[in-house]
């Protein structure tokens, strides 16, 4: 230790001589050394300088010196401060670790607690232990299945009732629909149906008979207009039969039959005018009477047919407006 103390030298004064020719600094130092000499007492107002390189005298007994600390003491204080700082750092680290590894908090390196994990309680037995608050608002699946089955049964019954009521409605409308034969399958388009000759009905409850040929043959225009009218009425009837039947919109044949048969009796509609003249017993005037009857019957039959066509068109127009044809399947 003594060798180390001898090697260490402290710089007490640092003299900076900027002017080499001016000995002002040296004179001041000489004066200071003279003042510090132990022979003379210290003057007040002057700085007291101590030489750190001097060895402190041995302590005689218990004696406290209030002077500056020796370098040995300074080194010991520095070592002690370093040790204390290291201990404080270690204690702070330990406190942090203890605070992090508490009973309620999980350790950062360990497995997390199961409280933070989420579980699906759909099929677990713990579901029965949970409170059933929403059980009255949402019915159980068994009741839902029962409701669905009851709904299915009710819909099946409604379909059966509707299917059972359909034939009765068709039968009710059959007296008016028998005038024009409707298609068996209502899904077919009315254009694809073949045009059949119309039927005539003498009474409301009588059976249907095939319509006889037109009595007046030499007039082709009236027959063409009658066929067009019958085809239009038949198409309208097919459209109405394919959809829900409208009893008020279908024209009844009772008004058309007496108009056509005004000149001829209903029982003798199929007989020609020649046969009528022969039954009366005038063989000499057959041709004349036939021509007269033809001439007389022409305007009546044509007027009657014109009336029937106009009436049928007037009645068929609201039917076309009421029953809108759907898209062809």
UniProtKB/Swiss-Prot annotation:
Tissue: Highly expressed in heart, brain and lung. Weaker expression in kidney and testis.
Complexes and interactors: Interacts with APC2. Interacts with KIF2A. Interacts with ANKRD53; recruits ANKRD53 to the spindle during mitosis.
Gene field: Psrc1
Sorted UniProt keywords: Cell cycle, Cell division, Coiled coil, Cytoplasm, Cytoskeleton, Mitosis, Phosphoprotein, Repeat
Superkingdom of the source species: Eukaryota
Biased composition (Basic and acidic residues): 114-126
The protein's name in its UniProt record: Proline/serine-rich coiled-coil protein 1
Taxonomic lineage of the native organism: Eukaryota, Metazoa, Chordata, Craniata, Vertebrata
Positions of modified residues (Phosphoserine): 22, 65, 70, 124, 185, 189
Region described as Disordered: spans on this chain: 93-329
Family, as annotated: Belongs to the PSRC1 family.
């Amino acid at each position: 230790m003594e060798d180390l103390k001898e090697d260490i030298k402290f710089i007490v004064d640092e003299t900076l001589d900027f002017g080499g020719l001016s000995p002002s600094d040296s004179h001041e130092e000489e004066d200071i050394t003279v003042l510090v000499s132990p022979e003379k007492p210290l003057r007040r107002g002057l700085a007291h300088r101590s030489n750190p390189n001097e060895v402190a005298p041995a302590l005689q007994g218990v004696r406290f010196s209030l002077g500056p600390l020796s370098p040995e003491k300074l080194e010991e204080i520095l070592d002690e401060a370093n040790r204390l700082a290291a201990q404080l750092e270690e204690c702070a680290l330990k406190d942090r670790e203890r605070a992090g590894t508490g009973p309620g908090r999980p350790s950062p390196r360990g497995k997390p607690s199961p409280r933070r994990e989420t579980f699906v309680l759909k099929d677990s037995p713990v579901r029965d232990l949970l409170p059933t608050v929403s059980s009255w608002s949402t019915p159980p699946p068994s009741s839902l299945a029962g409701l669905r089955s009851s709904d299915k049964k009710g819909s099946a019954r409604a379909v059966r009732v509707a299917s059972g009521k359909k034939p009765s409605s068709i039968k009710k409308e059959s007296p008016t629909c028998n005038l024009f034969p409707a298609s068996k399958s209502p899904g077919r388009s009315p254009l694809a149906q073949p045009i059949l000759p119309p039927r005539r009905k003498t009474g409301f409850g009588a059976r249907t008979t095939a319509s006889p040929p037109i009595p007046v043959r030499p007039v082709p225009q009236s027959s063409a207009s009658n066929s067009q009218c019958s085809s239009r009425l038949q198409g309208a009837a097919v459209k109405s039969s394919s959809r829900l039947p409208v009893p008020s919109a279908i024209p009844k044949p009772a008004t058309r039959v007496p108009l056509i048969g005004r000149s001829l009796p209903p029982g003798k509609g199929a007989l020609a005018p020649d046969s009528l003249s022969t039954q009366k017993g005038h063989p000499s005037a057959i041709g004349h009477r036939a021509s007269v009857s033809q001439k007389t019957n022409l305007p009546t039959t044509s007027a009657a047919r014109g009336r029937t066509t106009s009436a049928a068109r007037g009645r068929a127009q609201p039917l076309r407006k009421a029953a809108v044809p759907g898209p062809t399947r």
